[in-house]
Amino acid sequence: MSYFSRSSLASGAQILEFKGPETQLSGGATYVTGSGGNVSMGLTFSTGGRRHLPRIQATAVILDLAMVELVPVARPAPGASEGEALSLRPLLFLEANPEYIAAINATPFEPNVVSVGKPVNPIGIVTVEGRGLSEPVGRYAVLYLPESGPPRIEMQGAARSAAEEGAGSDGDARSRREAEEPAARAENALGGYFIILEGGKPQGPRELRSARSAVGLSEDGRKMIILAVAGDSPGKSVGLTAREVGRWLAELGAYRGLLLDGGGSSSLAVRRSPDAHFGSGGAGIPRMTIKPSWGPTLGVERPVASLLAVRPK
């Protein structure tokens, strides 16, 4: 596409140069941000733009998975029953953990809370280091992070359904165990909402524009795209539909994509590389890349149930 240019970094990451500010991250990641453009055209960034076109603000982090590690972050509530986690914020997580370079909100949850450390209920599977915090929701999808091999995006109910279908077959205990393995034995898994990119083809609802968070994987599983889109702010960013997010992921190189929790929960924090030469100051200091769209305090992250965090290997 002609809306942006690509170039390779010595680190093995890829930088996309939009008509807007950009900052290189450390450890195999690239941070790009821009605003403006025609939503219906996909990746169209412009510092000017025609005023009658919807405006978008978005940030993408392109990850070379040979150089970075993906880490699910969720904190079980002490003494709580299964299905509860303590709320946390991406920016505060980066501030407290200097080895990490990026963190995005992940699993949907209830209820909304206004401060960190409050019990919330993830909606869908969350598994961290083999400990399951919550159960799968069959209609939603999940990002699996296996100990070996590339990450995968699958339906949360697929493994359970396969296991149930084989339950009446004598001698198929091994098959049932294998079918159950992704959900039951996954070392790390973060549930999201829907698959919005399948085989490089966008899918999902076209109607509602909102703030969005999403992840996409390349066909060979070697690259991940993390995307955050600001929304619900006319004149600054109207957000994207689910299908539009799928198209953006495809344009950025993804083959399969997962929609994460969005709306007021959408938040992506990054840490600049100390040797970054873009912008003024702030090297190594975590910062938010999009302005969260929720009350009571606009611009402050909503505490969420889980994060997908990134650190160099």
Regions found by a protein language model. Name each.
Residues 1-136, 141-142, 146, 150-152:
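Zymogen propeptides
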